[in-house]
UniProtKB/Swiss-Prot annotation:
Its main location: nucleus. Residues 473-618 form the Helicase C-terminal domain. One of its GO terms (cellular component) is nucleolus. Its EC number is 3.6.4.13. Belongs to the DEAD box helicase family. DDX24/MAK5 subfamily. Keywords: ATP-binding, Helicase, Hydrolase, Nucleotide-binding, Nucleus, Ribosome biogenesis, RNA-binding, rRNA processing. This is ATP-dependent RNA helicase MAK5. GO terms for molecular function: ATP binding; ATP hydrolysis activity; RNA binding; RNA helicase activity. A motif (Q motif) lies at residues 172-200.
Length: 772
């Protein structure tokens, strides 16, 4: 009998075992789904609202196991459709179930290899499951389905009655304010040991149900003054039951996107410590209090999903919020039944071009809509008429209005709650119109006026330098070198920024622009660079004057004087924040003297600002540096303009489908009247060589030491100023040899000695000639 080897036997066994026929499966129909029904996962980004390394990309979400098909419409446009795709995990389980009956027909070797593969696959599945768990570790409530949110909320948060009490001895300054214990634990973790003046007065009124109108300088803690009563109320409420959407409790309206994101960051930072577990870790699951933002520049689709899943506090800008309200009746109902309405930076809000949207949002919160208004013919309000009949505004809604400026007359009228004060012959301001439309539930709102005398805080020192218009660059350069630190230079036009920026860049100063024509991504990047540089210089228009909380700003320079007192207050308020010292400098040219005098009178000043002492010995060297840098900047500007003109001519010709005469581009004729004037080649060569020579000259000037008068570099122990001790101890000025290291704050007194409008001592006064 022939011997059969093992391999032949294995082949025979395989042939004898007939493979089962594949079941005939029909192709499943495609299942289309909408974007709102999908489970979106938030993409983890870095801190500060996603701008640290995120390039301005914020609040991104991603999808898995979803296909996309593009359907072309009659007009040629393509519409994306989401197709449900079977996930890899479920598909793998089905395949394993189908292959299970076939395991008996395999050989021993094949079974062993299959077992090892199954074990490896199991490990891989476990690894994927762990990675998915890590991805779904809760960074934002928007990444969870509504059922998961409510179920996790029931499991993670204990009964509120079991909340442990807080030992007030740890924070004695907060003992008089009966806030939720979790908030006080957050204060302790954040080293927030004492409330500010506005907080100590606004918070007790807010937690007792009063309406509050607060007036305080910038940087005084107004954000927490209205946020803490809201969080105190929300933390005192019981958690929502499973399957019930979170109701919108508070709406915070801000004038700009940057301020709205900043407020949301403050709230989340406070809640992070307040809701932390005893071991200091962040609790798993959705937050007890959810905070979201609705601002322009981000995906409206994502913001709709956030609102649909439910949110306790919404921080929004009026424009984007009103766009969403017009498309969503449920959101309009949520706004109508608010528990808290906050208007932050009210004076800025009415200047930002969103007064119409703000007025419409405020109208939703009014208890009575019987009065006729200019928006009654709006189809949006007509569509909401039946909705308003079904839902009524809350009687216990609290309104918080905070601003850096508010007229005294308006404050008095708010206290009296007199509705007849507008028709006294005096035209009301837009801010007064806004406050008049607010339906305060409190008959006598708590008006807290902590605005400082003279419009600025006591820790701010002001000074001025009187110079000609052409010498402003020189004195600005001197100030930035003499007093290094984080400084903001305010100008009145974008053209001034475009002129100063290349000039001071050539002088090797860390300057960054900020104005409204910059893209949002570039604005955030420049702000981030300015914050990270302790000697950074921000040249900005009034877009940076309000709302932005930039820490540790040492100086504010008014290169051009503002036209209003409010703008001056907000500009100067970028420094001396949170009881820190600050310095504000005015550069005043002769044609601005009348503007400055009117500005000071509107601030109720009686004395001129003190002059900043100038060490004139440094000015000649600085003037020479500026002269060379200005020539370089002008030459580069001419070259850039010539290239721009040429490119414009080529693009215009291409758009009109015409040919250009080559002589217009390549001609050697030196004809300034030609459509495109092109200098001769030798002249262009001379221009390039001249710029290179100027750059070498500027480099040499920048390497030279700037020495004060009376100082000898070769003989430091002699001369009228002895600097040998400063050189040995390295205590002298880093840029100006022989200059003192005192701060600008210490160089001037709080108030000047000359009365406002009295003129300088020794100046020749013009005699008034009487007419005949």
């Amino acid at each position: 009998m022939a011997k059969i080897d093992k391999k032949t036997k294995l082949k025979l066994n395989k042939k004898s075992v007939r493979a089962p026929s594949k079941p005939t499966t029909e192709k499943k129909p495609k299942k289309y789904v909408t974007a709102d029904t999908l489970t979106w996962k938030p993409v983890k980004t870095s801190s500060f609202s996603g701008i640290d390394g995120g390039g301005g990309m914020m609040m991104l979400e991603e999808l898995e196991d979803v296909g996309i098909e593009w359907e072309e419409t009659d007009g040629g446009r393509k519409i994306a459709k989401f197709v449900e795709v079977e996930s890899k995990t479920s598909k793998g389980k089905k395949n394993a179930a189908q292959e299970e009956p076939n395991q008996e027909g395999r050989g021993d070797d094949e079974k062993a290899s299959s077992a090892s593969e199954t074990e490896e696959g199991k490990k891989a599945d476990d690894k994927e499951a762990v990675e998915e768990d890590d991805e779904e570790e809760f960074p934002d409530f928007a990444g969870f389905a509504e059922e998961d949110l409510n179920a996790a909320d029931e499991e993670e948060h204990p009964n509120l009655d079991d909340e442990p009490a807080f030992n007030d001895d740890l924070l004695p300054e907060w003992s008089s304010i009966s806030l939720h214990p979790s908030l006080k634990r957050s204060f302790l973790a954040s080293s927030f040991t004492a409330p500010t003046a506005i907080q100590s007065r606004a918070i007790p009124a807010g937690i007792t149900g009063r309406d509050v109108v607060g007036v305080a300088e910038t940087g005084s803690g107004k954000t927490l003054a209205y946020s803490l009563p809201i969080l105190h109320y929300l933390l005192g409420q019981r958690k929502s039951k499973a399957g019930i959407k979170r109701p919108l409790s508070a709406l915070v309206l801000c004038p700009t996107r940057e301020l709205a994101l900043q407020v949301m960051d403050h709230l989340n930072a406070l809640l992070k410590h307040a809701l932390a577990t005893p071991d200091g870790e962040k609790p798993q699951g959705p937050p007890r209090v959810s905070v979201g933002s609705v601002v322009g520049g981000l995906s409206a689709q994502k913001q709709k999903r956030i609102l649909e899943r439910g949110c306790d506090v919404i921080v929004a800008t009026p424009g984007r919020l009103w766009d969403l309200i017009k498309a969503d009746d449920e959101l309009a109902t949520s706004v109508r039944t608010l528990r808290f309405l906050v208007i932050d930076e009210a004076d800025r809000m009415i200047e930002n071009g969103h007064f119409a949207e703000l007025e419409s949002i405020v109208k939703l919160t009014q208890r009575s809509t019987a009065q006729q208004g200019p928006d009654d013919d709006d189809p949006v309000f007509q569509a909401m008429a039946t909705l308003f009949e079904e839902s009524t505004a809350r009687e216990d809604m609290q309104t918080f209005v905070f601003s850096a400026t508010l007229s005294k007359d308006l404050q008095k009228n708010l206290k009296r709650r007199s509705r007849s004060w507008k028709g006294k012959g005096k035209r009301s301001s837009t801010l007064e119109d806004l406050v008049e439309k607010l339906d305060f539930r409190d008959e006598n709102p708590e008006v807290i006026d902590l605005s400082p005398e003279g419009g600025v805080v006591s820790s701010l020192r002001e000074s001025m330098i009187e110079s000609t218009k052409d010498d402003k660059d020189l004195y600005l350069y001197y100030f930035l070198l003499r007093y290094p630190g984080r400084s903001i230079v305010f100008v009145n036009s974008i053209d001034s920024i475009r002129r100063l920026l290349p000039l001071f860049t050539l002088l090797q100063l860390p300057v960054f622009p900020l104005h409204s024509h910059l893209q949002q991504k570039q604005r955030l990047k420049n702000l981030d660079r300015f914050k990270s540089n302790p000697k950074g210089i921000l040249i900005a228009t009034d877009v940076a004057a309000r709302g932005l909380d930039i820490p540790q700003v040492d100086h504010v320079v008014h290169f051009n004087l503002p036209r209003t007192a409010d703008a001056y207050i907000h500009r100067s308020g970028r420094t001396a924040r949170a009881q820190n010292e600050g310095f504000a400098l005015q550069l005043v040219s002769p044609d601005e003297k009348s503007v400055q005098r009117a500005l000071m009178k509107s601030l109720e000043r009686t004395h001129e600002l003190p002059d900043l002492p100038i060490e004139a010995g440094f000015l000649p060297s600085l003037r020479e540096r500026l002269r060379v840098a200005t020539e370089i900047e002008k030459a580069q500007h001419r070259a850039t303009k010539a290239t721009h003109d040429k490119n414009w001519l080529l693009e215009a010709a291409e758009a009109m489908d015409i040919d250009i005469d080559p002589s217009m581009l390549d001609g050697e004729d030196d004809d300034p009247d030609a459509p495109y004037y092109k200098p001769k080649k030798q002249d262009r060569g001379k221009g390039k060589a001249s710029v290179e020579n100027l750059k070498m000259e500027l480099k040499a000037l920048l390497q030279e030491k700037l020495v004060a008068r009376g100082v000898s570099i070769r003989y430091p122990t002699s001369g009228s100023k002895v600097i040998v001790d400063d050189l040995i101890k390295s205590t002298g000025h880093g840029m100006l040899l022989g200059a003192s290291t005192s701060k600008a704050y210490d160089q001037v007194e709080k108030t000047g000695k000359r009365k406002l409008g009295s003129g300088r001592p020794g100046a020749v006064k013009k005699k008034k000639v009487e007419g005949r």
